[in-house]
Design a protein with these regions (language model features):
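Catalytic-histidine neighborhood of serine endopeptidases
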Residues: 90-92, 96-130, 136-141
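Terminal peptide-recognition signature
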Residues: 6, 37, 68-73, 86, ...
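Hydrophobic membrane-insertion alpha-helices, especially the h-region
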Residues: 1-3
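Active-site loop architecture of trypsin-fold serine endopeptidases
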Residues: 9, 77-82, 103-108, 142, ...
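A conserved glycine-rich beta-strand in the N-terminal activation segment of trypsin-fold
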Residues: 24, 53-61, 74-94, 109, ...
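N-terminal activation segment of mature serine protease catalytic domains
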Residues: 6-85, 107, 249
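Active-site substrate-binding loop(s) of clan PA
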Residues: 61-62, 121-123, 140-168, 243
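Short, well-ordered loop/turn sites that connect or cap secondary structure elements
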Residues: 89-90, 102-103, 147, 153, ...
């Protein structure tokens, strides 16, 4: 997850898991280009963001609904691997994650919570927004997430995060908190990003994973957390940031 500045603290990318060489994780700004095979002429996909309907779900119901749509993303680097999180966008295999998860990668694959893995190709890569879209080629439909309308999110709303903190050993970890701020302007290496702020715990390996509302809808892509030092090992807790999904769609 990413880095920037706010007072005496810094917003740092959530480094992506513990891979074989954790130091190979790079900040998206000024990062290395990826050589992951790109699908030429792919039209991509447009997200359909829905307003909440029905009653809020329990934490257990949210996890049961969303976790099957959360994948581990492994980007093979020249030395070691970068490990992050991603979200299945469509049943035919489109996956969204952070650009810094796959930056510098030579090949990439994703793993479902069932353990099934797919090699993926690159559809889109945007360093400015720290987003990447990958494409698997599954024989059977994948469990796509439901995406919510992040424009409706308010401070105090319940928020959940699911991902792979510290790598694959803890994959599928869910944390919870609230939406601490909306439209938070965060400066990262001289660039300003407008993000959702959350108190849900985000750690190494959560990059590219979902921020979820109490209806089990993905409302953001987890990207940053606050650090008090130049180290990617952030020492401040409860200050995480996500790209609003409405800006992604």
């Amino acid at each position: 997850i990413l880095g920037g500045s706010s007072g005496s603290g810094q917003h740092r990318p959530l480094p992506d898991g513990d891979g074989d060489n954790p130091s190979s994780i790079v900040d998206i700004f000024g990062s290395k280009a990826t050589s992951i095979p790109r699908i030429q002429g792919d039209p991509g996909v447009r997200l359909a963001c829905r307003d909440p309907q029905g009653q809020p779900l329990t934490a257990q119901e949210v996890y049961a609904k969303v976790n099957p749509s959360v994948v581990t993303v492994v980007s093979e680097q020249s030395e070691g691997a970068s490990i992050g999180t991603g979200v299945i966008m469509t049943a035919d295999g489109y996956v969204i994650t952070n650009a810094h998860v796959i930056s510098g990668g030579k090949s990439c694959w994703v793993a479902l919570d069932t353990g099934v893995t797919y090699e993926v190709n690159l559809v889109g890569f945007d360093e400015e927004e720290d987003l990447a879209v990958l494409k698997a080629d599954p024989q059977n439909p994948l469990p796509a997430a439901e995406f919510g309308n992040s424009d409706l999110v308010q401070v105090g709303d319940t928020a959940y995060a699911i991902g792979n903190p510290l790598g694959v050993e803890l994959r599928g970890t869910m944390t919870n908190g609230i939406i601490s701020a909306v439209n938070r302007a965060v400066e990262v290496d001289g660039k300003t990003m407008t993000l959702l702020q959350t108190s849900a715990a985000l750690n190494n390996g959560n990059s590219g994973g979902p921020l979820i509302n109490e209806y089990g809808q993905v409302i953001g892509i987890n990207t940053l957390k606050m650090s008090t030092t130049d180290s990617t090992e952030a020492t401040v807790e409860g200050l995480g940031f996500a790209l609003p999904i409405s800006s992604v769609s």
